[in-house]
């Protein structure tokens, strides 16, 4: 089975830290890559849903712009550790996508996201040969580990992709204080989309503010629009060239411009197949859309606690 989106059209974009702003050609290049990567994430996570498997779409979709900008600095040989550490394990789809785009695994492997026996788990599990260079749990379990990586690599900026959900965890508070005390060259890039698996933090935890919390721990904090590509580039570049721990807080709706899940908690989970079908049709990825409707869910006559004979997930 061939992957139905033209991922072979993906061309990495090389970026230099001495360049203060994107050129028009670099902007166009990045925008094309962002669109392709986001469309791919919509497709292969929805494909897992069509098979009756679980998965997560919105978080991975969200952080494509910032991750591809960081990747551009890595590719040009800048002093940035070449690992996309992510403390939000449910965004693992982007780890698999980048592993495929970087040649660590066949692109067709993405067709088996969340399938048993294929190694594309719901959270990152380290497998260097497949391009997954760290393991992480649900939320708030990785920052302390990355502090250790930053301690061992003082001459490189170490990037950790974070989330507003992760920043509610006590482990992150401890890790933040340690990073500040040790003046670690760690750059935290947070997707502040006001959505977690529990709902909207602004509703269930009023008064909590990611930027204020991190500033209180002593980090340099810069907040901005995660969908403003030019500003995002400039802010990431500044963070990478600023000594010590820096946090970028990127505001956006969950799954921007994805009808049916934009700004909603359901965007945290795997996108419903009908929403993905409409999205892919609108983007003129007709073969991908048709593949979603052609999938037949496997028959599992066994029943287990939390499932039934016609549902393979609870």
Regions found by a protein language model. Give the residues of each.
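Glycine-centered small-residue hotspots that permit tight backbone geometry or close packing
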Residues: 9, 89, 255-258
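Exposed alpha-helical structural elements
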Residues: 36, 40, 94, 108-112, ...
């Amino acid at each position: 089975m061939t992957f139905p989106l033209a991922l072979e059209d993906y061309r990495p974009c090389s970026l230099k830290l001495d360049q203060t702003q994107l050129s028009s050609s670099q902007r166009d290049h990045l925008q094309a890559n962002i669109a392709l990567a986001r469309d791919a994430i919509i497709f292969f996570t929805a494909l897992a849903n069509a098979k009756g498997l679980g998965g997560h779409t919105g978080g991975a979709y969200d952080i494509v712009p910032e991750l591809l900008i960081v990747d551009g600095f890595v590719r040009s040989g800048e002093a940035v550790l070449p690992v996309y550490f992510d403390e939000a394990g449910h965004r693992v789809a982007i780890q698999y996508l980048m592993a495929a785009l970087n040649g660590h695994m066949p692109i067709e492997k993405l067709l088996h996201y969340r399938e048993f026996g294929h190694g594309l788990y719901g959270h990152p599990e380290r497998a260097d040969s497949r391009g997954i260079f760290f393991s992480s749990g649900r939320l708030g379990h990785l920052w302390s580990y990355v502090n250790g990586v930053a301690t061992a690599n003082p001459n490189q900026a170490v990037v950790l992709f974070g989330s507003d959900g992760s920043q509610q965890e006590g482990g992150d508070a401890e890790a933040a204080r340690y990073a500040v005390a040790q003046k670690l060259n760690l750059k935290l890039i947070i997707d502040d989309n006001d959505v977690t698996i529990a709902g909207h933090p602004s509703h269930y935890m009023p008064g909590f503010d990611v930027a204020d919390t991190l500033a209180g721990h002593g980090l340099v904090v810069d907040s901005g629009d995660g969908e403003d590509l030019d500003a995002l580039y400039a802010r990431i570049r500044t963070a990478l060239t600023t000594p010590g721990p820096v946090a970028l807080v990127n505001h956006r709706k969950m799954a921007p411009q994805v009808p049916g899940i934009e700004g909603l908690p359901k965007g945290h989970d795997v996108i419903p197949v009908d929403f993905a079908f409409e999205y892919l049709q609108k983007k003129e990825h007709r073969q991908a859309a048709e593949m979603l409707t052609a999938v037949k869910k496997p028959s599992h006559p066994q029943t287990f606690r939390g499932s039934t004979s016609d549902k393979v997930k609870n």
